[in-house]
Amino acid sequence: MPIDTPYEDLLRLVTERGTPKSDRTGTGTRSLFGHQMRYDLSAGFPLITTKKVHTKSVIYELLWFLRGDSNVRWLQEHGVTIWDEWASETGDLGPIYGVQWRSWPTPSGEHIDQISSALELLKSDPDSRRNIVSAWNVGEIPQMALPPCHAFFQFYVADGKLSCQLYQRSADLFLGVPFNIASYALLTHMMAAQAGLDVGEFIWTGGDCHIYDNHTEQVALQLSREPRPYPELVLAPRDSIFDYTYEDIAIVNYDPHPAIKAPVAV
């Protein structure tokens, strides 16, 4: 059976048809605006196989978001350094993803736990078209070390299956997007487990989809490789989505090609 490769197809599309553009980092990109990828989560866990993805970082970053944390110290304690380039001397990143997900400030001084609210809505009104979690808090963007790239996501239930669609305003296709796909697929599995649902699709929608000019050789190497079957995800049962630990999450039968290193544009 052929392996669906929407990510690799997007890499190829941007390589062939992308527009050369300058960018904030001064690196330069090849860019395409507006694209969608769909993954059937019942058919396997969408962890890219044409290069090895550091799954430990994916899992710990998501758990860090769910903690409502925005300081890299907890990540560093678990050997994860993916946010270090943007952190202050004290490790702080400002009110980024986790803070907005778990503690969105209101004008009255109260805070909204968007993850808990989304989970409650999945249980009480699964057909709601308002089940959205946003990290794009316009009033607090100046305080953030980096404005949210994956800005907001929506849940959708049909036939007892939970799907999630993410909008990513800025998509570093080679380094960032494989992490983002795996992270939100994992979140969808966790939310489905807590709501008593099966998994449906993860849908990724990108705005500025770009390949940095200093990643072109790495992308060419990746596209020369034959995709392999996706792994499976096994979650231990937990009473709350906030109770999951790294040891509760197992990705089995992951057989990727070797990792490919590339510089991060900061």
Swiss-Prot record:
InterPro entries with a match to the protein in the record: Thymidate_synth/dCMP_Mease (IPR045097), Thymidate_synth/dCMP_Mease_dom (IPR023451), Thymidate_synth/dCMP_Mease_sf (IPR036926), Thymidylate_synthase (IPR000398), Thymidylate_synthase_AS (IPR020940)
Predominant location of this chain?
cytoplasm
Pfam families associated with the record: Thymidylat_synt
Q: Could you tell me one molecular function GO term of this UniProt entry?
A: thymidylate synthase activity
Q: Which GO terms describe its cellular component?
A: cytosol
The GO annotation for biological process reads: dTMP biosynthetic process; dTTP biosynthetic process; methylation
Q: Which UniProt keywords apply?
A: Cytoplasm, Methyltransferase, Nucleotide biosynthesis, Transferase
EC number(s) on file: 2.1.1.45
The disulfide bonds in this chain are none
Highest taxon of the lineage: Bacteria
Q: Locate the residues binding dUMP.
A: 24, 129-130, 169-172, 180, 210-212
Q: Which reaction does it catalyse?
A: dUMP + (6R)-5,10-methylene-5,6,7,8-tetrahydrofolate = 7,8-dihydrofolate + dTMP
Binding partners and assembly: Homodimer.
Described function: Catalyzes the reductive methylation of 2'-deoxyuridine-5'-monophosphate (dUMP) to 2'-deoxythymidine-5'-monophosphate (dTMP) while utilizing 5,10-methylenetetrahydrofolate (mTHF) as the methyl donor and reductant in the reaction, yielding dihydrofolate (DHF) as a by-product. This enzymatic reaction provides an intracellular de novo source of dTMP, an essential precursor for DNA biosynthesis.
Record family assignment = Belongs to the thymidylate synthase family. Bacterial-type ThyA subfamily.
Which named protein is this?
Answer: Thymidylate synthase
Lineage, please? Bacteria, Bacillati, Actinomycetota, Actinomycetes, Mycobacteriales
